Structure formats: structure tokens, C-alpha cells
């Protein structure tokens, strides 16, 4: 049997993540890249290949707002951990207050699903945030915990140890008072999800077991290679 490493235990993994400043270091590193971004598109598309508990993407969005204060921002955040999503949601209230035209999508879909324009296996749902202040949005977002527990259940393969979602969900969150401005960017089905992104975040605090090239291709296939960090 292969020797276990710290990330095979969620408790050990969380202990490592929460006792280091690695995520903050990554977020500030990303700030340096934002300054070099130039885009003429009407919306800025971001893919976070694994949001975790949201420290990196939340901090990154605050920095992105500094450079693109008036441009709509569209984020696809991929995550299968119920615990991580609940923490992520607690961070996003202030981001929606800071950047009014933010569209934040949370999904448990695979990368293959996101790149398949004809898939009918993904359920699309929307949440319109009502309010003006960060605390208004935070209350709504944190009330989603039962919804997340219900829709982010996993199935386990006893033969190979793999896990996958029991159902595939794509949840789109935006401010209701910005719906008119954002209506052309709110996805209704898989074909309306961006296939190219202006910025990809693919950050893990450990060495993946999967082959590096295979993993990079999964992350970068929907985006220009020179934006991969």
C-alpha cells in the first residue's frame, strides 16, 4: 500500500492550509498579473479550477475590482467540497457589494462538462441577491447551506476510490438590481458558459497524483495558454 501523505487526511490538509500564509501569498502574486491584463471584451471571464474555501478567489476579485471597477466580471468556480463552499459563500457578500456587476458561478461539474456545449446533464439554477450592503448579501449566501448539502452530494467508487457528484449543478449568483445590465451574460444552459477565459487560477497546496501534463491540459483547454498560472 502506498504511504499516505498529509493531504490524504482532510484534517491534516486543513491544518496545513490554515497554519500557513500560502493562500495569501498566492493571492498577492496574482495581483501582479492583473496589471498586465488587457481586454476589449464587454465582460472579464475568470475560471477558478478549484476554489477551496475561497481565500484566493475572494482576495483576487478585490484586486481585480481595483483595475476593472466598471467592467462586469464573470467567475466560474469549480468545487466539490460542501465545507469549502459554505466558507466561500461567507466571503462573497462583500465582493458583491464592492463590485456590483459580479456574476459568480459555483459548480461541481467536470472540466469535460464545462467544455461540452451539447451536454444536457447539468442543472442550471440562479440566485438573485436582494440588498445594497455586504451584510445583506452575506445573510442570503450563508442561508444556502441546506441547498449546498442537498445538491453537492458525492458518490464513491469502491473499486478505484474515485468520487464524483451524484448530480451536476451550475449555480449562478448575481445582484437582482443589476439583472438588466447582466442579462446577456447570465447562462441558461451549458452552451452559454464561456469556452475561453481571460484569467485562470489553478492553485493547489500539494503535488497532484495525476500526471502534470494531463492536469494542465484539463485546466487550460478552455483558455489561452499564456494566461495559465
Model-derived regions, located:
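Class I SAM-dependent methyltransferase Rossmann-like catalytic core
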Residues: 2-41
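Conserved class I S-adenosyl-L-methionine
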Residues: 42-52
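Local beta-strand N-terminus motif with an aromatic residue
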Residues: 43, 196-198
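Glycine-rich SAM-binding Motif I of class I
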Residues: 54-58
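Class I S-adenosyl-L-methionine-dependent methyltransferase module
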Residues: 59-194
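A conserved beta-strand element that flanks and buttresses the S-adenosyl-L-methionine
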Residues: 201
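A short, conserved alpha-helix within the catalytic core of class I
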Residues: 208-218
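Single conserved hydrophobic/aromatic residue that forms the stacking wall/gate
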Residues: 219-229
Amino acid at each position: 500500500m502506498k504511504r499516505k501523505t498529509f493531504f490524504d487526511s482532510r484534517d491534516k490538509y486543513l491544518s496545513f492550509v490554515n497554519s500557513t500564509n500560502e493562500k495569501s501569498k498566492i493571492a498577492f502574486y496574482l495581483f501582479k498579473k492583473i496589471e498586465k491584463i488587457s481586454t476589449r471584451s464587454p465582460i472579464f471571464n475568470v475560471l477558478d479550477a478549484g476554489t477551496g474555501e475561497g481565500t484566493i478567489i475572494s482576495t483576487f476579485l478585490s484586486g481585480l475590482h481595483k483595475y476593472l471597477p466598471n467592467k462586469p466580471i464573470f467567475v466560474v468556480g469549480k468545487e466539490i467540497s460542501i465545507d469549502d463552499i459554505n466558507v466561500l459563500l461567507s466571503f462573497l457578500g462583500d465582493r458583491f457589494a464592492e463590485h456590483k456587476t459580479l456574476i459568480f458561478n459555483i459548480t461541481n461539474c467536470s472540466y469535460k462538462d464545462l467544455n461540452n456545449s451539447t451536454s444536457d446533464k447539468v442543472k442550471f439554477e440562479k440566485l438573485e441577491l436582494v440588498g445594497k450592503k455586504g451584510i445583506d448579501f452575506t445573510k442570503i449566501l450563508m442561508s444556502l447551506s441546506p441547498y449546498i448539502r442537498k445538491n453537492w452530494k458525492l458518490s464513491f467508487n469502491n473499486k478505484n476510490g474515485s468520487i464524483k457528484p451524484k448530480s451536476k449543478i451550475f449555480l449562478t449568483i448575481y445582484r437582482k438590481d443589476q439583472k438588466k445590465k447582466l442579462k446577456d451574460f447570465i447562462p441558461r444552459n451549458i452552451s452559454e458558459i464561456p469556452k475561453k477565459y481571460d484569467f485562470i487560477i489553478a492553485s493547489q497546496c500539494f503535488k497532484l497524483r495525476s500526471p502534470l501534463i494531463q492536469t494542465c491540459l484539463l485546466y487550460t483547454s478552455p483558455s489561452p495558454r499564456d494566461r495559465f498560472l
